[in-house]
């Protein structure tokens, strides 16, 4: 199945200068960093990937109101596909597609057809798609919890190093 047979594909309309630090809505730009905006142009569930920069490496799952940069692509309005499942599928395989296409020509930006004409295999039942998405989401949650714990230990170690190596705390 081609991606274009599964969903609609479009781009945003906003520019980076449209960001507002304390904005109401998420604003997805050409980066993994999510900015803020006081306006939204979409209110849907979908998948975003960037059009240039670290192509094939930045993906966002969205659900609700958001603003979107003009060089970002949104896949939405899916036909019988669990969107979170599609997020995992697309984010896993799209980078390899970018690499394969770059062997034929220099690829420094994404074109709509790179997404639209990508072949994907989708389990036939929504139940299987949801089961896969749930397992992968649980794994991501576990990884995030471990990373948060790791970051906390690093901060504690830094504090201990500061105290011990400056002599503020003595062990003997």
Regions found by a protein language model. Give the residues of each.
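Non-catalytic DNA-recognition/assembly elements of restriction-modification systems
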Residues: 1-13, 18-29, 126
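Short, surface-exposed beta-edge/turn micro-motifs
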Residues: 23-25, 44-46, 70-72
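A short glycine-rich beta-alpha junction/loop motif
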Residues: 66-72, 104-127
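Extended Lys/Arg-rich polyanion-binding regions
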Residues: 75
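Amphipathic alpha-helical coiled-coil/heptad-repeat segments
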Residues: 122-172
């Amino acid at each position: 199945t081609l991606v274009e047979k599964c969903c609609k594909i479009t781009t945003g309309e906003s520019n980076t200068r449209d960001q507002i630090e304390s904005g109401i809505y998420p604003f997805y730009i050409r980066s993994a960093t999510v900015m803020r905006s006081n306006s939204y142009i979409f209110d849907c569930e979908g998948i975003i990937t960037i059009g240039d920069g670290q192509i094939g490496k930045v993906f966002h799952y969205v659900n609700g109101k958001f603003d979107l940069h003009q060089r970002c692509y949104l896949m939405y309005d899916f036909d019988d596909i669990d969107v979170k499942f599609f997020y995992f599928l697309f984010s896993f395989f799209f980078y390899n597609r970018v690499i394969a296409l770059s062997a034929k020509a220099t690829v420094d930006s994404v074109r709509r057809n790179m997404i639209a004409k990508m072949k994907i295999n989708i389990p036939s039942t929504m139940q299987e798609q949801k089961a896969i998405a749930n397992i992968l989401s649980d794994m991501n949650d576990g990884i995030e919890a471990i990373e948060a714990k790791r970051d906390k230990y690093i901060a504690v170690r830094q504090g201990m190093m500061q105290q011990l190596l400056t002599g503020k705390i003595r062990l003997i």
